[in-house]
Amino acid sequence: TTMDETTRRAIEPYASPAKKRLETLRTLNEAGIETWAFIGPILPLATEHRLEALLSGIADAGTKKVFVDRLRLKEGTWAMLEPSLRGLAEDLPQVYEKALEGPYFRDMARAIIDLAARHGLTAEPAF
């Protein structure tokens, strides 16, 4: 979801650092195992940050395909996610409400697909 370690620790505290995941992609690709990357969920105020570096790292690792996915809030998810994201913006609930109900995902997915293409990657929505 992000190359920013502070943000990653806040929203994905049990996930490996992005650099470690990129190293793993490189190792698998070098061994002839085809890989793909998943960027999701796309989070306002988090995913946009260092997106160029994330896609560049994916391409440099030899991965050719990227899937992107929207934020899908199931019951109880926001209550767990909101405290971690609180430091990103004062108007956080309004930002996320707009993202969930508006064209945010479509626009961000299009931006990611276009940016991915500039890095030689194929990107598409996951669902």
State where each predicted segment sits.
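C-terminal accessory regions of radical SAM enzymes
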Residues: 88-127
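Conserved AdoMet/S-adenosylmethionine-binding subsite of the radical SAM
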Residues: 1-104
